[in-house]
């Protein structure tokens, strides 16, 4: 008499929440690199900052690190990239503090009259 075993394997994505947490962690620990172009080949290479300026943010990146070449603009202030947060509409209960970059916000109450098109 023999026994049989069936084993089924599959890959499954992490939950959206877990993926978001990991991506945020990678963003917060991203490593700045510089790009140079090899004149002989025309190829661009990414190089880490020099070892003598070593800090937590300036270490040699691993293949799993998120890297960046230049700082992101401050989207809270008006610039060529963004109109800033002035005049932005937000939901007071959920996201005004983050969407207005902690600069405060004004509330406004509106009374709107609309015909109801009721049938009698």
Swiss-Prot record:
Where is this gene product found? Secreted, Extracellular space, Extracellular matrix
Keyword Nucleus in the entry? The reply is: no
- In this UniProt entry, which residues carry a covalently attached lipid of the kind O-palmitoleoyl serine? 1
Its BP terms in the Gene Ontology are: canonical Wnt signaling pathway; cell fate commitment; neuron differentiation
Q: List the disulfide bonds.
A: 90-101
Alphabetical UniProt keywords: Developmental protein, Disulfide bond, Extracellular matrix, Lipoprotein, Secreted, Wnt signaling pathway
GO MF, any single term: cytokine activity
Of which family is this protein a member?
Belongs to the Wnt family.
Name the chain's protein: Protein Wnt-9
